[in-house]
Amino acid sequence: MPMYQVKPYHGGGAPLRVELPTCMYRLPNVHGRSYGPAPGAGHVQEESNLSLQALESRQDDILKRLYELKAAVDGLSKMIQTPDADLDVTNIIQADEPTTLTTNALDLNSVLGKDYGALKDIVINANPASPPLSLLVLHRLLCEHFRVLSTVHTHSSVKSVPENLLKCFGEQNKKQPRQDYQLGFTLIWKNVPKTQMKFSIQTMCPIEGEGNIARFLFSLFGQKHNAVNATLIDSWVDIAIFQLKEGSSKEKAAVFRSMNSALGKSPWLAGNELTVADVVLWSVLQQIGGCSVTVPANVQRWMRSCENLAPFNTALKLLK
């Protein structure tokens, strides 16, 4: 297709003459053969390169930390989503052996505070319709470690209390003066929805729930556990209260399976030593009575081991 011809802007080999302004620094010719910096622009590019390098270095550090954080979150996510995560944890708690229950009792002043001239008195309100067996077991264990002044009272909100519950602490010998005891343990049978414990109105609020009170009382024995084992024990206590005691038949069956698996690896639920988890779970099993779920073999063996101990055996007699 024919087109009209346009004259060249510059002809021959004559260089192109363009008047450039003097208010800007000169840039290199992108079509030229030389790729060196333009005259007068070196200091600008050097400063620009240093700032870019610093920015890139910061960006690399941030990205590296983000990748590490993502890897850690992915690892935790896989651990949580694993069905047998709780059972796998029991394999790593063998590194730190817990202290035995019979040799290490805490100084009560370090836990309950120092009160000159006054007996440290723990007051528990419990409903006789649902006696907290775990607290009665712990009372017997406390008596083996400390000089305990034990008393039982009946609140006016309760019309009648069975004779065996009124004598749940046995015949108390109070010939010694009050100041000779290390700890006071007062049980009041009262019409309360949940078991309550009061120790010091000035320094602490009441503790509610059989599991929470059992945790507090068991801490007086001075057992020490690593973080993993302590978490496992707390988990068993919560399972006893919220799943085994208050859960459905399916939840109870799941608890028995978990207990059977754990007791197949160790004589007690959290290792080779008796813990508060064993006390609370045994108590709840006795309270729920004839459960429709079949009790596995390892759990039956564990229950016999508990009942062979005097504190458990004494508490068990209260149900008869």
Curated annotation (Swiss-Prot):
Impact after mutating residue 92 to V: In a lung cancer cell line; reduced interaction with TP53, loss of TP53 activation and loss of proapoptotic activity
Gene Ontology cellular component terms for the protein in this record: aminoacyl-tRNA synthetase multienzyme complex; cytosol; membrane; nucleus
Boundaries of every GST C-terminal domain copy: 220-317
Pfam family, one: GST_C
Mutagenesis / variant outcome for changing residue 238 to R: Nearly abolishes interaction with EPRS1
Modification comment: Phosphorylated on serine residues in response to UV irradiation.
GO biological process, one term: protein ubiquitination
Keywords associated with the record: Apoptosis, Cytoplasm, Developmental protein, Differentiation, Disease variant, Leukodystrophy, Nucleus, Phosphoprotein, Protein biosynthesis, Ubl conjugation
Keyword Calcium: no
Region (Interaction with TP53): 162-225
Molecular function GO terms recorded: molecular adaptor activity
Consequence when changing residue 209 to S: In a lung cancer cell line; no effect on proapoptotic activity
Location in the cell: Cytoplasm, Cytosol; Nucleus
Primary site of residence: cytoplasm
Entry-linked InterPro entries: AIMP2, AIMP2_LysRS-bd, AIMP2_thioredoxin, Glutathione-S-Trfase_C_sf, GST_C
Chain positions covered by the region annotation Interaction with PRKN: 82-162
Task performed by this protein: Required for assembly and stability of the aminoacyl-tRNA synthase complex. Mediates ubiquitination and degradation of FUBP1, a transcriptional activator of MYC, leading to MYC down-regulation which is required for aveolar type II cell differentiation. Blocks MDM2-mediated ubiquitination and degradation of p53/TP53. Functions as a proapoptotic factor.
Related illness: Leukodystrophy, hypomyelinating, 17: An autosomal recessive neurodevelopmental disorder characterized by atrophy of cerebral cortex, spinal cord and cerebellum, thin corpus callosum, abnormal signals in the basal ganglia, and features suggesting hypo- or demyelination observed on brain imaging. Clinical manifestations include lack of development, absent speech, microcephaly, spasticity, seizures, and contractures.
Note: Accumulates in brains affected by autosomal-recessive juvenile parkinsonism, idiopathic Parkinson disease and diffuse Lewy body disease.
Assembly behavior: Part of the multisynthetase complex (MSC), a multisubunit complex that groups tRNA ligases for Arg (RARS1), Asp (DARS1), Gln (QARS1), Ile (IARS1), Leu (LARS1), Lys (KARS1), Met (MARS1) the bifunctional ligase for Glu and Pro (EPRS1) and the auxiliary subunits AIMP1/p43, AIMP2/p38 and EEF1E1/p18. Interacts (via N-terminus) with KARS1. Interacts with EPRS1. Forms a linear complex that contains MARS1, EEF1E1, EPRS1 and AIMP2 that is at the core of the multisubunit complex. Binds FUBP1 (via C-terminus).
Name of this chain's protein: Aminoacyl tRNA synthase complex-interacting multifunctional protein 2
Species per Swiss-Prot/TrEMBL record: Homo sapiens (Human)
